[in-house]
Structures are given as C-alpha cells and as structure tokens.
Amino acid sequence: ITFTWTTNKDITTQTLTGCTLADETVRTATYDTDISSDKTFTLSVSDGENSASSSVSYKFMNNVFWGSAAAADVYDSAFVDALSNKKLTNSVKGTYSFNVADGEYGFWAVPSNMTISTVWIGGFEVTVESVGTISYLNSKGYTRDYNLYKTGQSGLGSISAEIK
C-alpha cells in the first residue's frame, strides 16, 4: 500500500503506522507487509505547537468461490481455484449465477466463519451438502480454512442461486 500526503505548513515531526519515514520532508511511504486482518493506518504530524492526524482503515475480506465441477475424491486448494467464479466479500448472502453442467454439481467454497444454511433456486429451497472443511492456500501464501458445499443434484443447467 502506498500512501501520499500533503501539508499546508512546515512540520517538525510525522509518523505513519507501520512505516518508517526518513524525516519530516517525506510525503510518501509504502507499507509492504501482507495484510491478513482489518488494519487502520494513522498519519500524525506536528509543527511543534499544533498536531493533526488522519486515519484510513482497510477491511480485510476473503473470497467466496463458486462454480460447477464433478464430485471429487479429494477437495483441496486446486479444486477451489478451479471454480469459475469468486468475489471478495464479508458475507456469503447474495445471488450466484452460473451454469451447472451435466454430471457436475454446483459448489461454493466459503471462509470457515461463514456457513450456508439455505439456498433458493427458481423460488424453491434446494438441498446443499457440506463436503467438509479444507485448508485453502491462496497464490500469496495466505492459508485459511474454507467450508465446501455442493448442490444435492447434478446437471442443474443455468441457475441463479440465492443464499439467504
């Protein structure tokens, strides 16, 4: 994350959460540590008499993955990555549109702090089965437990599934 700022007067000190600033003339900084939880950064400046600060917060979110696939003997990170859709979110609730091909099932992989209890397709409640929890490793080396669910029926065709 790169930060850039300006001041309307000369300052004598400044600090920015998690960043080393060479001196009071610097007006840009980079935070190059991976973020795996919500984080707030605060820039504090002083001219020797008066102080001011400003903060910005980043909300850490995980992906929800969904798509069509054949049932597998082993569910792992590669299986989840092969699902055709993903979105960053802090809630699994919403509408998921995709095609469930013949011989395949609809799958959702959701962070372990989320669960799927009800799925509606075409106005009808449908059964989804939990196929377990996997330890998902993303391309950045971040590991998170994910719950994996699949539709009870295969070959549903083009669907718009609502998770409530």
What is each model feature region?
Residues S46-M61:
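Short, exposed coil/turn segments at beta-strand boundaries within extracellular/luminal domains
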Residues T25-A29:
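Short S/T/G- and acidic-enriched coil/turn segments that sit immediately N-terminal to beta-strands
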Residues F3-T7, F107-P111:
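Aromatic/hydrophobic beta-strand junction motif of beta-rich domains
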Residues N63-E104:
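Extracellular receptor-binding modules and their adjoining Ser/Thr/Gly/Asp/Asn-rich linkers
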Residues T13-C19, S154-K164:
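Extended Gly/Ser/Thr-rich low-complexity repeat segments
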Residues T30-T40, G48-N50, G141-S158:
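Surface-exposed, short loops/turns at beta-strand junctions within beta-sandwich domains
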